[in-house]
């Protein structure tokens, strides 16, 4: 995979500062291009990561009931405006054939998918498909809720508005009771 070109980012940030009428050589902005390049390397680190890699290690566990990890905090960058959006992901699956993954692997998959220029809808479906393709569970349900700075800082300017997306596969798609169980667990306060 291609590495982030920090030098090119630094040059581009310097040009942006000049284009908005700022002096990139003034004290407060002198190291800004370097800081932004370093930040972009971090926030876009998922570009070189395949979320399916996190599900290669499985535990042979005879558990074919609901597994839910909720409130997985994440942040990403809107690919349309390159401003952040952030929120929580909730991942439920019902293992099949003893293929149980580590709980932290679900959170790592969220990180891998969110740390790139992204759409919330794609984050949601990519996580679900990665689990389906690697673990072959009875069902997967991924719900993502996020606040988008592109709706808060510009345009419609509606702070606090949340977008909710879901990807439903297998038994959760076909069985309303199973789907409702997951949604009730997600809504339940700790």
UniProtKB/Swiss-Prot annotation:
Oligomer and partners: Toroid-shaped homodecamer, composed of two pentamers of five dimers.
Domain of life, source organism: Bacteria
Gene expressing this chain: folE
Enzyme kind, highest EC tier: hydrolase
UniProtKB keywords: GTP-binding, Hydrolase, Metal-binding, Nucleotide-binding, One-carbon metabolism, Zinc
Binding residues for Zn(2+): 78, 81, 150
The name this protein goes by in its record: GTP cyclohydrolase 1
UniProt GO cellular component terms: cytoplasm
GO biological process, any: tetrahydrofolate biosynthetic process
Family: Belongs to the GTP cyclohydrolase I family.
HAMAP family, per the entry: FolE
Any one GO molecular-function label of the UniProt entry: zinc ion binding
Reaction equations catalysed: GTP + H2O = 7,8-dihydroneopterin 3'-triphosphate + formate + H(+)
Enzyme Commission identifier(s): 3.5.4.16
Organism in which the protein naturally occurs: Bacillus velezensis (strain DSM 23117 / BGSC 10A6 / LMG 26770 / FZB42)
Metabolic or biological pathway, per its Swiss-Prot or TrEMBL entry: Cofactor biosynthesis; 7,8-dihydroneopterin triphosphate biosynthesis; 7,8-dihydroneopterin triphosphate from GTP: step 1/1
């Amino acid at each position: 995979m291609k590495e982030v070109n920090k030098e090119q980012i630094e040059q581009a940030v310097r040009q942006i500062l000049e284009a908005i009428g700022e002096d990139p050589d003034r004290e407060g902005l002198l190291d800004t291009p370097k800081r932004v390049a370093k930040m972009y390397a971090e926030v876009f680190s998922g570009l070189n990561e395949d979320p399916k890699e996190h599900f290669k290690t499985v535990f042979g566990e005879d558990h074919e009931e609901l597994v839910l990890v909720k409130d997985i905090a994440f942040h990403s960058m809107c690919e349309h405006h390159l401003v952040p959006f952030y929120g929580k992901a909730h991942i439920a699956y019902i293992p099949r054939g003893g293929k149980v993954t580590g709980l932290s692997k679900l959170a790592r998959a969220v990180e891998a998918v969110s740390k790139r220029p992204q759409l919330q809808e794609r984050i949601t479906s990519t996580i679900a498909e990665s689990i389906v393709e690697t673990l072959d569970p009875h069902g997967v349900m991924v719900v993502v809720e996020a606040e988008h700075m592109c709706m808060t800082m510009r345009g419609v300017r509606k702070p606090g508005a949340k977008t909710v997306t879901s990807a439903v596969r297998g038994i959760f798609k076909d069985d309303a009771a199973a789907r409702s169980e997951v949604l009730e667990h997600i809504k339940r306060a700790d």
